[in-house]
């Protein structure tokens, strides 16, 4: 992979780093690009393409076809807080989602502008598969909804790709589809649907370096976590195959991101690197693959920079008063 260095703030990120020029790179420049936004849960950049000793061939291939971001961070290592930041472009203290929706925390108002409202106003059909985990839910008027539960038991995982196929087939206009997977949230489950085919044990791995110590229990937790990452990679592969089979892949920007770090020592719920550093890969049609980006932060996180950039590129109104805008 080649390395692109930039002095831009930390997330020249999410959706369309290339600006309006992206439109000329899809197969039909008169069409707005579709957006497939993939979110996995409770995982940092412990993925093969980031150098972790775990087999994630589908995400590795996506990175080889697009851009891998080395310094992507969220403003808070909690599910609801980071997801609200992704969709509003605001810090938790600015949008009000300072705690988990499970505990009845929510945004200050359902009127806060967000990605879903912005893209709907720009003529996009919007859909979500998997949990939203932000309050109030009414603030996000998705046209299509499926599997609204957290699904930590990992039941009927094939339904994620099946519902995606249904949504994409029904979308004659440009679409925004957000797919939220339950892995790698606890409880760590060794295998689901016989995935991974060859699960790891604590004897196969070392503890993740940011833990600071290597203990048999931490090595086992690391193995359990890696098994979740191998499994979610397989499900993401199924999802990308659905997109390819639809014939719309060449007109679709694909974004993959984790919501925050792993639920491990010095990870989730903390402000350590293991809690707030996330993986982020963007693949968009017609651009050179195999790129890596190391953004130098001058304030703001990946989550903040997301919304101002994508709404501008897609022809929707550009949000004002957002961090990094």
Across the structure, where does each feature detected by a protein language model lie?
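Formylglycine-dependent sulfatase
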Residues: 2, 7, 21-325
């Amino acid at each position: 992979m080649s390395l692109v260095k930039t002095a831009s703030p930390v997330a020249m990120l999410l959706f369309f780093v290339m600006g309006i020029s992206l439109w000329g790179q899809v197969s039909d420049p008169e069409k707005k690009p579709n957006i497939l936004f993939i979110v996995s849960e409770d995982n940092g950049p412990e993925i093969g393409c980031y150098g972790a000793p775990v087999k994630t061939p589908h995400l590795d291939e996506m990175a080889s076809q697009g851009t891998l971001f080395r310094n992507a961070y969220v403003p808070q290592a909690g599910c609801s807080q980071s997801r609200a930041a992704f969709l509003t472009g605001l810090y938790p203290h600015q949008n009000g989602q300072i705690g988990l929706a499970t505990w009845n925390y929510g945004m200050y108002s359902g009127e806060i502008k967000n990605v879903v409202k912005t893209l709907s106003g720009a003529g996009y059909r919007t859909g979500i598969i998997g949990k939203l985990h932000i309050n109030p839910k009414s603030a996000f008027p998705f046209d299509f909804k499926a599997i609204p539960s957290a699904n930590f038991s990992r039941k009927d995982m094939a339904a994620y790709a099946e519902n995606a196929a249904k949504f994409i087939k029904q979308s004659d206009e440009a679409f925004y589809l957000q797919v939220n997977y339950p892995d790698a949230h606890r409880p760590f489950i060794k295998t689901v649907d016989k995935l991974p085919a060859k699960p790891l044990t604590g004897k196969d791995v070392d503890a993740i370096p940011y833990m600071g110590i290597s203990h048999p229990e931490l090595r086992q937790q690391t193995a359990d976590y890696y098994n979740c990452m191998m499994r979610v990679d397989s499900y993401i592969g199924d999802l990308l195959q659905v997109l390819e089979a639809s014939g719309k892949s060449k007109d679709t920007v694909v974004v993959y991101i984790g919501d925050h770090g792993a639920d491990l020592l010095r990870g989730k719920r903390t402000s350590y690197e293991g809690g707030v550093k996330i993986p982020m890969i963007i693949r968009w049609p017609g651009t050179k693959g195999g790129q890596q980006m190391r953004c130098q932060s001058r304030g703001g996180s990946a989550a903040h920079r997301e919304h101002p950039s994508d709404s501008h590129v897609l022809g929707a109104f550009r949000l004002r008063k957002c961090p990094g805008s």
